[in-house]
Amino acid sequence: MVVGLVRLLRLSNSLPASLLVLLGARLADAPLHNQRLWLAVAAMWAITAFGYVTNDLSDQAEDRINKPDRPLPTGVITSGQARVVAILLFTCALLCSAPLGLAPFLIALLALGLLTLYNRQLKSAAGMGNLLIAGLAAGAFLPGVVAVYGWQWVRLLNLVPAVLGLFFFVLARELLKTVEDIAGDQAVGKRTFALAWGSQETRYIIGGLTVLLFGTVIALFPWWRYAWPTTALMLIGVVLPLAWTVYSLTPQASLSQIRQCLALLKGAYFVGLVALWLA
């Protein structure tokens, strides 16, 4: 049960997502001991975990094919238990965001609503859901700055390179996931990006996003005076694995190869976090 709950909450993904709030605050020179900042971190974790739990509730049919070892398909966690967890996370997100002010509270409520909409409808909207997830992920840099300083646009603008870089990277990885999940999504009649456009066309889009990420790192990072180790680490540890993924995603690529690429990109994501911490 405990292991199943840990997997349901996707701690390896939801905790790093909450750390993006801290990272954004650091990039804006905010004091990391600020209580409001940690409320924003907790709210982001609850929102992200809520998204994963409701995703598993919505995807049970296809997960029996694509991810049969997940807690709901295996029966380790029941649908009823998962719904209770989702309600608790929803409540936690709102309770943590409420002390930060009306605007942060409404933004948290909007994020929860968008994640629910994604899991119920947008995931089948051939790219719309992927854009939403990438946007929400990239936006995770901002709440910490707002929690500490309010809407100080000069500080928020300093996050532009990091936000753009994360958006391109997450969108590329999200599109690759649609290739991984073709079998299950096709079986339940979903119209994901890979099913609508084909795996090779998806590869070309990922290639384009790789170029955009490369351009962001080369042009914007030095322009915004991010430290040079950040640029070097991003190129070697993030852009290069993404380029390798594009190279590997041939028509003959097996499911295991696609999953290896996804694992590589997950590692690249953490390298990117370290790189930005050095910025």
Locate the predicted segments by residue.
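Small-residue-rich segments of transmembrane alpha-helices in multi-pass membrane proteins
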Residues: 17-24, 73-74, 131-148, 194-199, ...
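Extended hydrophobic alpha-helices typical of membrane-associated regions
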Residues: 3, 14, 222-279
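Structural signal for membrane-spanning alpha-helices in multi-pass inner-membrane proteins
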Residues: 21-28, 93-101, 115-119, 140-148, ...
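Multi-pass membrane catalytic core of lipid/isoprenoid biosynthesis enzymes
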Residues: 42-43, 60-108, 190-226
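Intramembrane alpha-helical segments
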Residues: 2-7, 73-153
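C-terminal ends of transmembrane helices
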Residues: 56, 61, 113-126, 174, ...
